[in-house]
């Protein structure tokens, strides 16, 4: 790669942390001055990753036990790593967060110790069930607030009160109301609440694929995506914008976060777009649009596809194959718009001397494609389970990275990848746990069906109008939320309306998933657009 482009990458990276911290709560973690605390947290995170590798290879404990362990360690790490508010010190660990971390572990400890009795009680909670259940719910809400902001916890609290005071509502949303102990029981000691399907997928598929992404990142795959996109499209008309589309699509499919994707690739691509003449607003818009689209691009699709497959009871390959055409059309539309804008404004590509050659990029890091090809084979053609595919893809990635010196990972790098994976999984896992409160209440009260009936009533049983109202509902429900909770909420609340009108469940779920993601681009929240504007200087 040319020296000039490399310098631009380094300059863009200087603002990386500042932009991430402004728009992504996940990046506001503590950096301790006390080395002993740092080592302790690293040990917990690495142990967490090793636990998931072990269970994926040799089998997990009983469902409730496995999910409770997953949630407890997630909560523990969040309270140790993330301060109670943005202005709090990030170099010291306050005593109250240590206590919260220990209490978090006790919520799983209780289930592990009393598991047989919990099963034998058959859904009739005792006092300890209620106490630990309430504690867990409060901890999940607070951890979700620290990681994702206020939107998801507030929505979860509203649903909790809806379960308690359903009699106070009128019309189709009225229900008989449920006692406190019944609601807590639904959320804690069953697999329909906090320990429901969402956290189950987080504790199995999602964690492993995030860990896979972390190992790829340590091997230099992110830089490879940027370089190969630059080599392929950098010299074409309006090239840097097309580079943004390709790089963001590649990376977004794996990392699952639109904001992180914007910042990771945008700090490199947006300055390049500005240099060839694209305006600030257009540069930011291209990066935001491309980054959001990565979550509908196979093979990983930001991990949401795995939840869809689990909820619908269909093979993952069915979801990924069905997503190829709409994802292709999405990116074709973006690239076409870029090309037309470049032609209109007379924007040329970069000079050949400023960009790397495809052959040079492939020679240096082309072998990193092999783990992705292996993953595609395992998911689509081998007939093996997703967990099996994810585990062995991680192993293959480590082995392939050792082939060349430029990507070789020492033991320190491997441990760093395990820690990176565990940390990166926190935001997804806690979002899934918080969404479990919403889904648990919706299941208990029948809220999803009630909302579906309301949408159909407003649409007058017209499929077109129902699609329009469902689209609006998905965009509203997805505002300010990560992609995975967005899909879970929209599939629970909005998809049933489409199914009642005769649309196949899979088609309905894909519809709500796509439009839920577009909340990242839709005012007034538009978090991906805000992050891109922070880099481009647009408005």
State the predicted function of each range:
Residues 1-120, 130-134:
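Conserved, well-structured core domains of diverse proteins
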Residues 2-39, 45, 321-424, 529-539:
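Long, contiguous bundles of hydrophobic transmembrane helices that form the permeation core
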Residues 41-46, 66-79, 96-105, 130-139, ...:
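Hydrophobic mid-bilayer segments of alpha-helices in multi-pass membrane transport proteins
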Residues 85-89, 109-123, 147, 167-180:
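Transmembrane alpha-helix boundary signature
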Residues 127-131, 192-205, 231-245, 276-282, ...:
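Membrane-interfacial loop-to-helix junctions in multi-pass transporters
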Residues 142, 146-147, 157-172, 180-223, ...:
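Core transmembrane alpha-helical segments of multi-pass membrane transporters/permeases
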Residues 226-294, 300, 304, 313, ...:
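Hydrophobic transmembrane alpha-helices that form the pore/transport pathway of multi-pass ion
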Residues 362-510, 514-522, 537-539:
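Long hydrophobic segments that form regular secondary structure
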